[in-house]
Amino acid sequence: MAASVDLELKKAFTELQAKVIDTQQKVKLADIQIEQLNRTKKHAHLTDTEIMTLVDETNMYEGVGRMFILQSKEVIHNQLLEKQKIAKEKIKELEQKKSYLERSVKEAEDNIREMLMARRAQ
């Protein structure tokens, strides 16, 4: 019977180790994505700040691939605001995903601790 419990604990530890490694990779990926989105948001904000200093009737060129499109200041301003809003929403989603992953690993660790305590109590 002790061998079956030890085998069960060994299996649980291996699963936990795999889950921890997988979660760490996912958390690192989420951190990288959050950093990238923060840079995108900051870039859009700085660009918007610069174009707001120009006269309202100013037309500007927007780079699209290999070409440039003539746009009004208002259109570009709205695009930059939308870009910031989308980046903010994605950052919020990634933060939630990251906290969920960390919570799930903690729960798995707690479950193994409970198994060890039950094993010691026997």
Curated annotation (Swiss-Prot):
Keywords: Acetylation, Chaperone. GO terms for cellular component: centrosome; prefoldin complex. It holds the Pfam family Prefoldin_2. One of its GO terms (molecular function) is unfolded protein binding. GO terms for biological process: actin cytoskeleton organization; B cell activation; cerebellum development; protein folding; telencephalon development. The modification N-acetylalanine is found at A2. CDD domains: Prefoldin_1. Belongs to the prefoldin subunit beta family. Binds specifically to cytosolic chaperonin (c-CPN) and transfers target proteins to it. Binds to nascent polypeptide chain and promotes folding in an environment in which there are many competing pathways for nonnative proteins. Heterohexamer of two PFD-alpha type and four PFD-beta type subunits. This is Prefoldin subunit 1. The gene is Pfdn1.
